[in-house]
Amino acid sequence: MTKITNDLFLKAARKEQVDRIPVWYMRQAGRSQPEYRKLKEKYSLFEITHQPEICAYVTKLPVDQYGVDAAILYKDIMTPLPGMGVDVEIKSGIGPVIHNPIRSFQDVEKLTIFKPEIEVPYVLDTIKLLADDMLDVPLIGFAGAPFTLASYMIEGGPSKNYHQTKSFMYREPEVWAILMEKLGRMTANYLIAQINAGASAVQLFDSWVGALSRADYAEYIRPVIEMIVREVKAVHPTTPIIMQAVGASHLLEEWETMPLDVVGVDWRETITSARKKVPTKAIQGNLDPSTLLAPEKCLKEANRILQEGVLEPGYIFNLGHGVFPEVPPEMLKQLTNYIHERSEILLKKDDIK
């Protein structure tokens, strides 16, 4: 296995002292990069993600180009679902489309047991290739969290309000619990397999869980998240687990009482206020990705965020959501350099101004 020579990200995830703030970006690999767009002229998304050498190349690009302190596996949160019998298609301009949406107990009952080594060997081969031969920074594996996956499976695709998902959850609580159990087992097994293959950390993407109230989260979602984290930690107790959601600041206190290591926040929550709600966790975030299209504003906001981030150990600079396709790669390189240089200065100062 290639030795990790830059462990800033892992130190921050463990709330240890660092000499500069680590930085990486959600969706840092892929559609905003000219090299990726050139690949897409020759290969489909399916081909890119199913060929370990190509997928590893795409995953590593931001490390080489931007100098980020962690790589995140280039995959989709839908990747494991076909291994459970879900007929999913990623449509350009739309996103995931489910051709056999869940409508009943019978549909949930049909979901099969997911075995990562059998269903997604190409994912594990990509991780092994990166960890063994290509990276000197930590590799982050990831999975979609059960609520977000269920919302696609029930709605049949992207949704703005999740009415069908919520009504199913409210009307059929017993069936919902079975669905969560199945998705939870799949997610835990998937994350464990990624760590076994060489991932240094894992992130749970619960993109749409902010649509739920805290009371509903506690009743319908918290048990399965606790189960996932518990099962992963039982096998890999020292591997950092990150929880990432959008518009979910009202759920921070729920995550504080789980054995998570890092909590991601978006631009709706300041780093300072987030720390008060999750004092035992490292914080990741929280630049609005829209500012990447306004360079002067971007660096100004980054400086403001850093002023708060450096006040305590356990801070990782990131966005509150993913990189847009329109973002120039040069902007991400400039921002990465700025975060490294500015945070190093701030961390050396006794008085932060």
Curated annotation (Swiss-Prot):
Annotated GO CC locations: cytosol
Top EC class for this record: lyase
Site (Transition state stabilizer): 76
Pathway stated in the Swiss-Prot or TrEMBL entry: Porphyrin-containing compound metabolism; protoporphyrin-IX biosynthesis; coproporphyrinogen-III from 5-aminolevulinate: step 4/4
Compartment list: Cytoplasm
Major subcellular location class: cytoplasm
Single annotated GO MF: uroporphyrinogen decarboxylase activity
One Pfam family linked to the record: URO-D
PROSITE patterns from the UniProt entry: UROD_1 (PS00906), UROD_2 (PS00907)
Catalytic activity, as annotated: uroporphyrinogen III + 4 H(+) = coproporphyrinogen III + 4 CO2
One GO term of the biological process aspect: protoporphyrinogen IX biosynthetic process
Documented EC number(s): 4.1.1.37
Signal peptide segment: none
InterPro entries registered for this protein in UniProt: UROD/MetE-like_sf, Uroporphyrinogen_deCO2ase_HemE, Uroporphyrinogen_deCOase
Keywords: Cytoplasm, Decarboxylase, Lyase, Porphyrin biosynthesis
Residues that coordinate or bind substrate: 27-31, 46, 76, 152, 207, 321
Keyword Metal-binding attributed: no
Entry's family note: Belongs to the uroporphyrinogen decarboxylase family.
NCBIfam families (UniProt xref): hemE (TIGR01464)
Protein name: Uroporphyrinogen decarboxylase
Organism: Listeria monocytogenes serovar 1/2a (strain ATCC BAA-679 / EGD-e)
